């Protein structure tokens, strides 16, 4: 319901192809290159409800996505909450990253969620700085990893 309203009902577009299967296998084995890969799998890179989804958020999964993208392509990853370890993984895989805090749809039990947008070329990342939430500054005595 909400995705169609937000995106101009892409499933009604004759150019849309829906593939049902394992996204890890698709990106790892595809000879095609994509303009965008959007991951809304499980609860994001933490709190898996299906342990099999974890490999998608591993170095191998992110590198498979990176290889499947066109040079000017971008990867977007939805999550229930921010995750510094995952942000470091994205940058460690050679991607430039911005994290956005986004409002949940009306009636959802959560007020907001997070989306990382990552690309090799920082210039193609969305520039809506109002929604960008930079990593929290480390405070004295804070032992939380950056």
Q: For the regions a protein language model found, what residue spans apply to each?
A:
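The AdoMet/dcAdoMet-binding core of the Class I SAM-like
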Residues: 1-69, 77-78, 93, 102, ...
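SAM/dcSAM-binding transferase cores
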Residues: 29, 34, 91, 98-146
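Short linear functional motifs in flexible/disordered or boundary regions
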Residues: 49, 77, 87-89, 109, ...
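Glycine-centered, small-residue-biased loops immediately flanking beta-strands
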Residues: 73
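Short, surface-exposed acidic/glycine-rich loop or hinge patches that mediate macromolecular interfaces
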Residues: 80-81, 105
